[in-house]
């Protein structure tokens, strides 16, 4: 209803101003601004809904604001371009419509009415309401009854007898198992669900609606609310450090805790969370690539589910034979939005719905087959009698190609338990939520029946039963949950440990690189990883007077305030205000001590604008003073006009990438010397090793031969035609995810370049 009211007010404002208000620059600007805000809000809602399926929520703040480079970005490029073009077109059309009667005299009453209607359209819009609620949830003081409902369990299980296998199915909500709605979609896993304890009403609450949040909720009994935004959990060195979670209790009770997934463990800080809470054995894409049968068999996120579950089965066998008490957690990925992936070993590779193939449903049907096969192996083993198997979704499906069909059903998360020691077949329709999962498992294993805000669904009463308004109640508890982080509120002194690549202050530790916004009562960490925006782009969003501490590789800040460090890959610390004074300090000791020193200076807006503009220069447009092309820093020497076919900088250099261009092209501002030596320090990737690699300047071509290790080769060129472009053609670019950013399409690697130098020859 609010959508219709909001749109009606918007339309009325446009029509009244266009036909009645007449000419007035101020009223035109004010009305266009408010109407434009309405458009931006609704496009933001549309874009957020495209990713989350639930509008503007904590998942948007946590995962999408700074994490798109790790979220399968290639699949969202076209929708993103469409949104930008649509926004431009709408603004242009709005301006044209509002100025239709610009030659008529101004009418104050109609102008005021149009502006009020525009303001009303913004206020009534769902996007404004959702953002307002998010802002309120950040600023509340908390709820006095939080302490009464938050309960810490005993740190041990008195007499543990059962091993635990816990399977998180990515977005594998219970709705998929409705055979009437989706016939024969999940026959294998659905049959296993019906053999166990099936909890049919597992609700999704705020702060539990994306993977790491679902894991925190199910293991710690609390939503993931944090004192920072974006993907900062990937940067912290501990995760809810004061809380007792399921992994802590298992470890204290003699369990060895294992976690296996196909994606990179660093994504969203899963490695930090698990290591902080009892898990000593973690396997992700980096750890598995040396042990899996085919390390090249991967999707955009990591290894396929059949590979991951095969490794999980091997680990289950190994641990069961050892006689050691253990827990084995695993997380699938093939059902990740927007389309999912199909493992090659599946029999169920295609599922048609609504008269046509549906990729998301196909991925679900394939993944559930793999999960069921893994469970059936355990059930057929002699160790099943000592094992509890848990299968749950990490969260409800986000906006995938099946989402509109899911939304027609009563949606719930998946949670069922198969007990090898005590077979029990029952569907339990108790009202519950994801936070109850850990408490229920703990109860089955012989521990307490409560965990944080979670309660066992076998012997306790869920918060979802106690509070009819549990979603609002959860948001009211948000400040109380944030306080559980024990996060510092000030930063005066800090220490940088170069061996561990961490910064420590006020009892907290963070991974480097890191940007910090420092105010009187708050310190906000903003990390950089493969999954967040570069720190300089984040810093460019700071206000002129915002205090910052920026710890990064020296060359990244050198172009602003320390040109002498333009080629240094050491750590540097910069601090100050963008509109005031800044200092850059070189970290020259293994353990380096620093102090914050923010001077109360007059803000120079011209300086601020210059700093922001420089911070926003894209990597390929950065230029530095050097007599050679150094590939492990961003940009190129001043003599280079442009270049293409080259991937991003890495610690050693850069790969050629045929996805960006079949050839490596480096165009110089001026013609290359008549006679020169080309000194190339590089290596080859895969089948490009020991193959002739053409290197061209104008009409002259030389051959470069590289191995898999870095070597330096000198080629001699004559350049009678005054050519200004160097071309290198890798003979056989290889499609691979090696060293790739999680969620990105594979790169096509040819040669790895460390340095290229042009040396003029005499004569």
UniProtKB/Swiss-Prot annotation:
Gene3D superfamilies listed in its UniProt record: Alkaline Phosphatase, subunit A
EC id: 2.7.8.20
GO cellular component terms, A-Z: plasma membrane
Pathway field: Glycan metabolism; osmoregulated periplasmic glucan (OPG) biosynthesis
Compartments reported by the entry: Cell inner membrane
Source organism superkingdom: Bacteria
EC primary class: transferase
Principal localisation: membrane
Gene Ontology MF terms in the entry: phosphatidylglycerol-membrane-oligosaccharide glycerophosphotransferase activity
Keywords: Cell inner membrane, Cell membrane, Membrane, Transferase, Transmembrane, Transmembrane helix
Keyword ATP-binding on entry: no
GO BP, sorted A to Z: glucan biosynthetic process
TM annotation in the entry: 1-21, 26-46, 77-97, 108-128
CDD domains tied to this protein: LTA_synthase
Record membrane topology: Multi-pass membrane protein
Family the UniProt entry places it in: Belongs to the OpgB family.
Function: Transfers a phosphoglycerol residue from phosphatidylglycerol to the membrane-bound nascent glucan backbones.
Record's protein name: Phosphoglycerol transferase I
Organism of this sequence: Escherichia coli O139:H28 (strain E24377A / ETEC)
């Amino acid at each position: 209803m609010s959508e219709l009211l909001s749109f009606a007010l918007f339309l009325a404002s446009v029509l009244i101003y266009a036909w009645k208000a007449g000419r007035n620059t101020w009223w035109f600007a004010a009305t266009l601004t408010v109407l434009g805000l309405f458009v931006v809000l609704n496009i933001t809602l549309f874009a957020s809904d495209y990713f989350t399926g639930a509008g503007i929520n904590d998942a948007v703040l946590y995962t999408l604001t700074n994490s798109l480079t790790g979220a399968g970005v290639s699949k969202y490029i076209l929708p993103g371009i469409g949104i930008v073009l649509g926004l431009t077109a709408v603004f242009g059309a709005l301006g044209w419509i509002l100025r239709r009667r610009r030659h008529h005299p101004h009418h104050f009453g109609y102008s005021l009415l149009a502006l009020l209607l525009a303001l009303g359209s913004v206020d009534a819009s769902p996007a404004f309401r959702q953002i307002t609620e998010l802002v309120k949830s950040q600023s509340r003081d908390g709820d006095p009854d939080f302490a009464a409902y938050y309960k810490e369990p005993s740190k041990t299980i008195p007499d543990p007898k059962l091993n635990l296998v816990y399977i998180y199915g990515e977005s594998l909500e219970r709705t998929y198992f409705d055979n009437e709605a989706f016939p024969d979609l999940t026959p294998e896993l659905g049959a296993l669900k019906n053999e166990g304890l099936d909890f049919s009403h597992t609700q999704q609450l705020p702060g539990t609606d994306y993977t790491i949040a679902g894991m925190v909720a199910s293991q710690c009994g609390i939503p993931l609310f944090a004192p920072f935004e974006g993907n900062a959990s990937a940067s912290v060195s501990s995760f809810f450090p004061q809380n007792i979670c399921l992994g802590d209790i298992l470890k204290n009770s003699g369990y060895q805790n294992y976690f296996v997934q196909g994606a990179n463990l660093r994504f969203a800080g899963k490695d930090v969370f698990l290591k902080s809470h009892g898990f000593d054995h973690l396997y992700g894409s980096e750890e598995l690539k040396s042990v899996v049968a085919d390390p090249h068999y991967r999707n955009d996120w990591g290894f396929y589910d059949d590979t991951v579950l095969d490794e999980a089965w091997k680990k289950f066998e190994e641990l069961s034979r050892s006689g050691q008490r253990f827990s084995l957690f695993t997380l699938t990925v093939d059902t990740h939005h927007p389309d999912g992936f199909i493992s090659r070993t599946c029999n169920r590779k295609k599922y048609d719905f609504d008269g046509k193939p549906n990729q998301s449903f196909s991925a679900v049907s394939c993944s559930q087959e793999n999960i069921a096969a893994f469970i059936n192996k355990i059930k057929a083993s002699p160790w099943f009698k000592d094992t509890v198997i848990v299968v749950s979704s990490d969260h409800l499906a986000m906006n995938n190609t099946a989402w509109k069909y899911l939304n027609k059903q009563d949606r719930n998360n998946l949670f069922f338990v198969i007990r090898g020691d005590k077979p029990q077949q029952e569907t339990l329709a108790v009202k519950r939520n994801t936070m109850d999962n850990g408490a229920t498992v703990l109860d089955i294993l012989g521990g307490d029946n409560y965990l944080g805000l979670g309660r066992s669904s076998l012997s306790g009463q869920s918060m979802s039963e106690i509070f009819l308004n549990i979603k609002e109640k959860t948001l009211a508890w948000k400040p109380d949950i944030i306080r559980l982080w024990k996060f510092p509120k000030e930063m005066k002194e800090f220490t940088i440990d170069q061996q561990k690549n961490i910064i420590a202050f006020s009892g907290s530790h963070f991974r480097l690189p890191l940007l910090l916004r420092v105010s009187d009562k708050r310190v906000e960490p903003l990390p950089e990883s493969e999954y967040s925006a570069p720190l300089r782009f984040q810093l460019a969003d700071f206000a002129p007077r915002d205090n910052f501490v920026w710890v990064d590789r020296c060359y990244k800040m050198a172009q602003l305030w320390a040109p002498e460090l333009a080629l240094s890959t050491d750590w540097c610390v910069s601090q100050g205000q963008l509109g005031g004074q800044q200092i850059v300090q070189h970290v020259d000791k293994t353990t380096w001590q620093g102090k914050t020193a923010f001077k109360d200076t007059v803000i120079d807006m011209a300086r601020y604008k210059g700093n922001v503009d420089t911070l926003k220069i894209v990597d390929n447009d950065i230029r530095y003073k050097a007599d050679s092309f150094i590939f492990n820093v961003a940009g190129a020497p001043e003599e280079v006009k442009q270049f293409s076919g080259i991937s991003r900088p890495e610690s050693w250099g850069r790969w050629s990438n045929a996805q960006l261009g079949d050839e490596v092209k480096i165009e110089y501002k001026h013609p290359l010397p008549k006679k020169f030596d080309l000194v190339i320090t590089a290596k080859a990737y895969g089948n490009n090793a020991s193959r002739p690699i053409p290197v061209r300047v104008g009409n002259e071509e030389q051959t470069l031969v590289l191995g898999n290790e870095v070597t330096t080769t000198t080629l001699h060129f004559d350049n009678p035609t005054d050519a200004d472009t160097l071309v290198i053609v890798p003979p056989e670019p290889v499609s691979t995810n090696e060293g790739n950013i999680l969620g990105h399409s594979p790169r096509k690697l040819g040669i790895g370049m460390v340095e290229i130098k042009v040396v003029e020859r005499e004569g």
